[in-house]
């Protein structure tokens, strides 16, 4: 768990994703993060373990496709967002709401 913090770890984790569903997942030792589009599961695991000093057991990722919207009659597409659901070991926790 004493992984060295690399500057690339800050590029992998973009922001915590705080929603009602993410709050329900936190009861099962899971935390949801918005991550870089090109980030892989091993990179996400290494970044979370190094930045938050916790043990990660599982990483699930998904890419939420951006919606097509209209502005002044012209269609445009919102950007895609990649999310990672990080499951922590028993007894581990991350408080992502402490800075809010």
Swiss-Prot record:
One of its GO terms (molecular function) is structural constituent of ribosome. One of its GO terms (biological process) is translation. The keyword Glycoprotein does not apply. Keywords: Ribonucleoprotein, Ribosomal protein, RNA-binding, rRNA-binding. The keyword Nucleotidyltransferase does not apply. One of its GO terms (cellular component) is ribosome. HAMAP family: Ribosomal_uL23_B (MF_01369_B). One of the early assembly proteins it binds 23S rRNA. One of the proteins that surrounds the polypeptide exit tunnel on the outside of the ribosome. Forms the main docking site for trigger factor binding to the ribosome. Belongs to the universal ribosomal protein uL23 family. Part of the 50S ribosomal subunit. Contacts protein L29, and trigger factor when it is bound to the ribosome. This is Large ribosomal subunit protein uL23.
